[in-house]
Swiss-Prot record:
Transmembrane segments: 15-35, 233-253, 276-296, 315-335
Topological relation to the membrane, as annotated: Multi-pass membrane protein
Record's protein name: Putative hemin transport system permease protein HrtB
Function: Part of the ABC transporter complex hrt involved in hemin import. Responsible for the translocation of the substrate across the membrane.
Organism encoding this protein: Staphylococcus epidermidis (strain ATCC 35984 / DSM 28319 / BCRC 17069 / CCUG 31568 / BM 3577 / RP62A)
Cell compartments where the protein resides: Cell membrane
GO cellular component labels: plasma membrane
Main subcellular localisation: membrane
Record key words, sorted: Cell membrane, Membrane, Transmembrane, Transmembrane helix, Transport
Record note on quaternary structure: The complex is composed of two ATP-binding proteins (HrtA), two transmembrane proteins (HrtB) and a solute-binding protein.
InterPro entries xrefs: ABC-4/HrtB_transporter, ABC3_permease_C
Family the UniProt entry places it in: Belongs to the ABC-4 integral membrane protein family. HrtB subfamily.
């Protein structure tokens, strides 16, 4: 540890340069990760909010909430098995400041209501709660809004916290208003579903159970967006490993004579390797930590309309991966350090 720290202080400019490179790479990875998470949440954040992991929907090859049509008789049969009220979902077009905004309207179901950022849930047919992203369109608490094809003027009484489905903002409104639409989807959400109840539901003609993963995997935009973004993140990790490998390998070559002298005076290869690992770990940790602080600060000032999300889970994962990638990327330096002969390094072989 002492040797590693002394070398960092002696070659501080060199190590600051590497730390800066790590900082830039971490910024890129974190920002793209934040965008990937943000885009993902615009497709599936409703599932975090409605507090359920089992769904009862219309039987279909690729279950999708907005396509789940359940007749009254099927709903009656389902209600005999699970003690849950159904969700109703329909597309609506809001008129906001002269512009049209397509949204997904859902009703309020006890124990499965999305979290509120401010205000309260609708209490009558003239009230609505909107997703927070709609505030970027100029819609706020107590504002009035019209819906295309509906004569009712709605009052915004609540702001929902990050609730979206398939890139559509979720708006909570009275069930009777949703059922006025031509295509109304019906589905059930539950937390607990026994094997027996699941079998009973699946035996109802035209009805099936589905997990959150079943539903999200069939959202076309979710699948289309995540794969290329994930590949970009993986590519950045590979580039990071290559860059760090080049930097540390060149540094090791430049220090060949110093390493040879240290070996000649009795410093073991194990001690030198430990010193190198500590150097890599320290500058990688500091570089990534600074990048994470910067990204967290940036995330606080980004507009709500921008799909960006970063949390402690992402922060920890990026830090751990960078530490691992940093060590893997410097494996060539380990090999070079082990092979350095003290006599040749200090010119004794000539």
């Amino acid at each position: 540890m002492n040797l590693a720290w002394k070398e960092i202080k002696f070659y501080k400019f060199r190590f600051i340069l590497i730390m800066f490179i790590i900082f830039l790479m971490a910024i890129m990875v974190l920002f793209i990760s934040g965008l990937a998470q943000g885009l993902a949440r615009e497709n599936i954040s409703i599932f975090d909010q409605i507090k359920g992991n089992q769904f009862v929907v219309q039987k279909m090859k690729e279950p999708q909430l907005e396509k789940s049509i359940l007749s009254r008789s099927k709903q009656d049969n389902i209600s005999k098995i699970i003690d849950e009220k159904p969700f109703k979902m329909a597309g609506k077009t809001f008129k906001i400041n002269g512009n049209e905004e397509n949204v997904m309207a859902i009703n309020s179901v006890k124990n499965h209501q999305p979290n509120l950022k401010s205000g309260h849930y609708p209490k009558n047919g003239n009230q609505i709660a909107i997703n927070e992203k709609l505030t970027a369109e100029g819609l706020y608490l107590d504002d009035k809004v019209k819906v295309k094809g509906d004569d009712t003027t709605y009052k915004v009484v609540g702001i929902l916290k990050n609730t979206m489905y398939s890139h559509s903002n979720i708006v909570m409104m009275d069930q009777s208003k949703i059922e006025q639409s031509s295509n109304v989807a019906t589905f059930y959400v539950t937390n607990q579903l026994s094997k027996s109840d699941k079998n009973k539901i699946n035996h109802i003609k035209g009805v099936q159970t589905a997990t959150t993963d079943n539903i999200t995997s069939n959202i076309a935009s979710y699948k289309a967006e995540q794969t290329p973004l994930d590949m970009m993140i993986i590519s950045l990790y590979i580039i990071t490993a290559i860059v760090l490998s080049a930097f540390f390998y060149v540094m090791t070559i430049q220090k060949t004579s110093e390493i040879g002298i240290l070996k000649a005076i009795g410093i073991t290869t194990k001690h030198l390797l430990t010193s190198l690992i500590l150097q890599i770990s320290m500058i990688t940790f500091i570089g990534v930590a600074i990048a994470e602080v910067v990204i967290l600060l940036i995330s606080q000032i980004l507009p709500v309309s921008m799909p960006f999300h970063i949390d402690m889970h992402n922060i920890i994962i990026v830090l751990v991966i960078f530490m691992i990638v940093g060590l893997i990327g410097t494996s060539l330096s380990f090999i070079k350090l082990i092979k350095i002969d003290p006599i040749e390094a200090i010119g004794g072989g000539q």
